């Protein structure tokens, strides 16, 4: 995964109270799971579990025998009831087979998405499911327009194309969510406390900061200063055999 994900430990204590969109995405994803694939699964894996925001929904909504959680480090504040797989999901070995794999607001950090889904395909049991959310190309577009810094997001159709090579598409959905802040400074604080962008890697001078705040005035509305999120939702099933070259 991209190196910015390594900095999550700095914001972990503040994440859940500030990750308003990610929480909404988690709840919506679980609704789609309940509607489309049910809640009975033996072996469950969550990729990029972070502080356990989505994990709590799994524990509440899914009937499982074993729960495996993955992230670069263990930020979970509660103990017991899971096996932790520490490391970059693109690099670690997945020796178990899973009935369902979840991930909420993590795959935007992946370097090679197609290689990852090949790996996850092989790690699913027959008829297993991959259910995840991520972000699209218009995510945080206001900040990127000003700074020219941001992640290189895949488009919705690119995700569908990659997924369709290996899985049956069960459900897919995308939308836009808007947050409003009292000032451009509050926009930056929000991004810092949720770790959602790579802007923090840039060395800002005082002039850069002033220029950012002045430029952000173009996104001022009656509700406040606009920040756009672009969530994607996917549920896919492993119901066909794929031949690898």
Curated annotation (Swiss-Prot):
Gene name tied to this protein: bioC
Q: What is the lineage of its organism?
A: Bacteria, Pseudomonadati, Deferribacterota, Deferribacteres, Deferribacterales
State the UniProt keywords alphabetically: Biotin biosynthesis, Methyltransferase, S-adenosyl-L-methionine, Transferase
The free-text function statement in the UniProt record for this protein reads: Converts the free carboxyl group of a malonyl-thioester to its methyl ester by transfer of a methyl group from S-adenosyl-L-methionine (SAM). It allows to synthesize pimeloyl-ACP via the fatty acid synthetic pathway.
Q: What is the annotated signal peptide range for this record?
A: none
EC supergroup of this enzyme: transferase
What is stated as this protein's family in its record? Answer: Belongs to the methyltransferase superfamily.
Name the domain of life this protein comes from.
Answer: Bacteria
From which organism does this entry originate?
Calditerrivibrio nitroreducens (strain DSM 19672 / NBRC 101217 / Yu37-1)
Query: Which pathway is this protein engaged in?
Result: Cofactor biosynthesis; biotin biosynthesis
Name under which the protein is recorded: Malonyl-[acyl-carrier protein] O-methyltransferase
By its UniProt entry, which NCBIfam families does this protein fall under? Answer: BioC
